[in-house]
Amino acid sequence: MTAQILDGKATAAAIKSDLTVRVAALKAQGITPGLGTLLVGDDPGSRWYVNGKHRDCAQVGIGSIQRELPDTATQEEIEEVVRELNANPECTGYIVQLPLPKGIDTNRVLELMDPEKDADGLHPMSLGRLVLNETGPLPCTPQGVVQLLRAHGVEINGAHVVVVGRGVTIGRSIPLLLTRKSENATVTQCHTGTRDLSSHLRQADIIVAAAGVQHLIKPEDVKPGAAVLDVGVSRDADGKIVGDVHPGVREVAAWVAPNPGGVGPMTRAQLLVNVVEAAERAAAEAADAAAAG
C-alpha cells in the first residue's frame, strides 16, 4: 500500500476560489475585507511568512495593511500599533507575527488585540468561544486539518484521533474542534512525555503529528489504513526543515498529509477565511442595525 496524498495546495486553491466570490459580493456592498500584519524586526523567516500572506490576499481581492517596526521597538510602540489596527476600519482581521523580540510581553500584546479582528483564532476570547461552542474565528491550523480531511472524504465522525503535541497553535486547540458535534471524533491527546506513545498511535484512525520532533511517527506506529497528518516542524543536522512523520509511513497509511505541501497551505487559506468571515459578520451586523434603526 502506498498512501494517497492529502493535497493541501489543491484544497487551499479551491477555498481561495470560493473566497474570491465572497469577497466580490462584499465589495458590491461597499465593503473590502482587509488583512493587517504587524512585523517587528527583520527575521527572514517571519518576513517570508508575512509576504506570503499578503500574496494570498492579492489572489482573492483582500486588502493588505502592513505595519512594520524595528527590532528595537518598545512594548509601548508595539501596543500603539495594535491599538491603531484595532481602530482601523480597513482592517477586518490581523495578525501579530511571532516571535516578538526578547523583552516584549507577548501575551500582553496579544490580549490587547480586538478579538473580533483575531485572524489567527488564538486570542483568549476566541479560544474561550470555541470551548463554549460559540461563533468566532477558528484556529487556522486545526481548522485547516479538518477541512483537508473533509475535502478528501476521510471520515472524521466517530473516528479515533490521536494528537501528538501540546502547543496552543495546534496540540491544545485541535481537540476542541474535533470533539464538537459537527466533527464528532474521539480524541486522545499525547505529547513527548507520553509513556508508550506507540501503543496509542497504533489505535488511531487519524494521527495529527505536531510535536516538532524529527520522524517521531514511524511506520511501525501506524495502523494500516490510517490517515496521518504531519504538522510538526524541526531541523535536521544540516539545518533542513523536516517533519514529525517518517517517510516510511507512506507504505502503511492510506492517507498522508506531507510536510511541506499538506497542512501548511490550508493554514494560510484559513487565515483568509477568518478575515472574510469577520467582514461578513460586520456587514450583517450593520445591516441589522440599519433595519432596526
Curated annotation (Swiss-Prot):
It catalyses: (6R)-5,10-methylene-5,6,7,8-tetrahydrofolate + NADP(+) = (6R)-5,10-methenyltetrahydrofolate + NADPH; (6R)-5,10-methenyltetrahydrofolate + H2O = (6R)-10-formyltetrahydrofolate + H(+). CDD domains: NAD_bind_m-THF_DH_Cyclohyd. InterPro entries: Aminoacid_DH-like_N_sf, NAD(P)-bd_dom_sf, THF_DH/CycHdrlase, THF_DH/CycHdrlase_cat_dom, THF_DH/CycHdrlase_NAD-bd_dom. This is Bifunctional protein FolD. Keywords: Amino-acid biosynthesis, Histidine biosynthesis, Hydrolase, Methionine biosynthesis, Multifunctional enzyme, NADP, One-carbon metabolism, Oxidoreductase, Purine biosynthesis. It comes from the Bacteria. Pathway: One-carbon metabolism; tetrahydrofolate interconversion. One of its GO terms (molecular function) is methylenetetrahydrofolate dehydrogenase (NADP+) activity. The lineage of its organism: Bacteria, Bacillati, Actinomycetota, Actinomycetes, Kitasatosporales. One of its GO terms (cellular component) is cytosol. Belongs to the tetrahydrofolate dehydrogenase/cyclohydrolase family. Catalyzes the oxidation of 5,10-methylenetetrahydrofolate to 5,10-methenyltetrahydrofolate and then the hydrolysis of 5,10-methenyltetrahydrofolate to 10-formyltetrahydrofolate. It comes from Streptomyces griseus subsp. griseus (strain JCM 4626 / CBS 651.72 / NBRC 13350 / KCC S-0626 / ISP 5235). NADP(+) binds at residues 165-167, 192, 233. Transmembrane segments: none annotated.
